[in-house]
From Swiss-Prot:
The lineage of its organism: Bacteria, Pseudomonadati, Pseudomonadota, Gammaproteobacteria, Enterobacterales. This is Putative protein HokF. The chain crosses the membrane at residues 5-25. Toxic component of a type I toxin-antitoxin (TA) system. When overexpressed kills cells within minutes; causes collapse of the transmembrane potential and arrest of respiration. Its toxic effect is probably neutralized by an antisense antitoxin Sok RNA. Disulfide bonds: none annotated. Keywords: Cell inner membrane, Cell membrane, Membrane, Toxin-antitoxin system, Transmembrane, Transmembrane helix. Pfam families: HOK_GEF. It is found in: Cell inner membrane. Signal peptide: none annotated. It is a single-pass membrane protein. GO terms for cellular component: plasma membrane. Belongs to the Hok/Gef family.
Length: 50
C-alpha cells in the first residue's frame, strides 16, 4: 500500500513541476516565497550558449 502512495506522489510531482514551469515562464531564474518573518529565495545562475 505504501508503494501505491509513493507512485501517486511521484506522478503528482512529475505533473506539478512542468505546470509550475509553464506558469512561471520567463521569471524562472529567481523564485521567492515570503511568509511572515521567513523569506525563501532560490536563484538559478547560468550562462546562455553563445
Amino acid at each position: 500500500m505504501l508503494t501505491k502512495y509513493a507512485l501517486v506522489a511521484v506522478i503528482v510531482l512529475c505533473l506539478t513541476v512542468p505546470g509550475f514551469t509553464l506558469l512561471v515562464g520567463d521569471s524562472l531564474c529567481e523564485f521567492t516565497v515570503k511568509e511572515r518573518n521567513i523569506e525563501f529565495r532560490a536563484v538559478l545562475a547560468y550562462e546562455p550558449k553563445k
